[in-house]
Amino acid sequence: MTALARRYDTQIHRRVTRTVMVGDVPVGSEHPIVVQSMINEDTLDIEAAVAGIIRLAEAGSEIVRVTTPSMAHAKAMGQIRKELRQRGCSVPLVADVHHNGVKIALEVAQHVDKVRINPGLFIFDKPDPNRQEFSPEEFAAIGQRIRETFEPLVTLLRDQNKALRIGVNHGSLAERMLFTYGDTPEGMVESAMEFVRICHELDFHNILISMKASRAPVMLAAYRLMADTMDKEGFNYPLHLGVTEAGDGDYGRIKSTAGIATLLADGLGDTLRVSLTEAPEKEIPVCYSILQSLGLRKTMVEYVACPSCGRTLFNLEEVLHKVRNATSHLTGLDIAVMGCIVNGPGEMADADYGYVGKTPGVISLYRGRDEIRKVPEAEGVEALIQLIKEDGRWVEPA
């Protein structure tokens, strides 16, 4: 299929990426897009950290990240993993490592399935306020230091068959990248590519890459440029999507969706996290809703409902809530709730079941395009449930 044809195709065509195993969870274009999050408990509080990880796993997080800012935190991950396994929780664990973290990373790699590093902070030198530029020789010398520091971690992860995320943040680019490329997507991409090339030279390919920023336009440009740069250099590593520091509430969700969904629609992205300033488990439904809205994963009922107008023959908002409350535990179904006959049958043609107001006080129930029966409005929701049961597609709520 040509690029132009893909642009107008109703199916999303994912960028082809290699499979990277994070524990027993495969990440890559041949697999469903993976949902993940991060606990906000102190890693040194073993019980609280374990409880937070279990809450996230039960909410649907398929990978869980934990911060490890010190050697003590890194060692605590061993006990956390042990406690989780004793409680029957096998969710893959990721250690988040930042400032000058190679010793921490080498320790924590023994206890987790993946290590995340930040290229801008992996070798952290205090910025020199008097510096005007980096000469090519200075730039290359720091690159050599990075390689010498990074190589032991790459070798360990490769030999233990663990994974690595090269996680660039727009707000923490290294000083030499800022001087050379500016505060730009180009600087973000080169920060990542420096580490990607080292991994490739050391025959380590269990890597994922992220290009996070707090502004969606910057994040979009960085991910697109990263994908193009990898394609040009012959790399096909998976992308981890996210808008960092998105905030909370409706705006935080909208901001994250604007960035993540746009890239997913372009075919970019193999795993995602929605970062909210809220309890981490509240991030998970947003992730699954983004994926479902694009047809990339179906994990809940898809509801089709008109916005209501003067033609509506029943209280659409109230009825939709009743239908949702009765059926939201089901998976894999499309249910349409339409207020009148004008748009009803046409708009819900792709739905498995339809609930349509045709005449006052009467509901028409549909299976696909076929009208099955008419029932009094007061019996509409129960009759819909009965129709689903007749088709063998009903399960009782847990």
Swiss-Prot record:
Keyword tags: 4Fe-4S, Iron, Iron-sulfur, Isoprene biosynthesis, Metal-binding, Oxidoreductase
A biological process term (GO) from this entry: isopentenyl diphosphate biosynthetic process, methylerythritol 4-phosphate pathway
Family, similarity comment: Belongs to the IspG family.
Name of the protein in its database record: 4-hydroxy-3-methylbut-2-en-1-yl diphosphate synthase (ferredoxin)
Taxonomic source organism: Synechococcus sp. (strain CC9605)
Gene Ontology MF terms: 4 iron, 4 sulfur cluster binding; 4-hydroxy-3-methylbut-2-en-1-yl diphosphate synthase activity (ferredoxin); iron ion binding
Reactions it catalyzes: (2E)-4-hydroxy-3-methylbut-2-enyl diphosphate + 2 oxidized [2Fe-2S]-[ferredoxin] + H2O = 2-C-methyl-D-erythritol 2,4-cyclic diphosphate + 2 reduced [2Fe-2S]-[ferredoxin] + H(+)
Keyword Iron-sulfur among UniProt keywords: yes
Pathway: Isoprenoid biosynthesis; isopentenyl diphosphate biosynthesis via DXP pathway; isopentenyl diphosphate from 1-deoxy-D-xylulose 5-phosphate: step 5/6
Disulfide bonds: none
InterPro entries, A to Z: Dihydropteroate_synth-like_sf, IspG_bac, IspG_bac-typ, NO2/SO3_Rdtase_4Fe4S_sf
SUPFAM superfamilies, sorted: Nitrite and sulphite reductase 4Fe-4S domain-like
Residues annotated as binding [4Fe-4S] cluster: 306, 309, 340, 347
Gene3D superfamilies: Dihydropteroate synthase-like, Sulfite Reductase Hemoprotein, domain 1
Cofactors named for this entry: [4Fe-4S] cluster
E.C. no: 1.17.7.1
Role summary: Converts 2C-methyl-D-erythritol 2,4-cyclodiphosphate (ME-2,4cPP) into 1-hydroxy-2-methyl-2-(E)-butenyl 4-diphosphate.
Co-factor: note: Binds 1 [4Fe-4S] cluster.
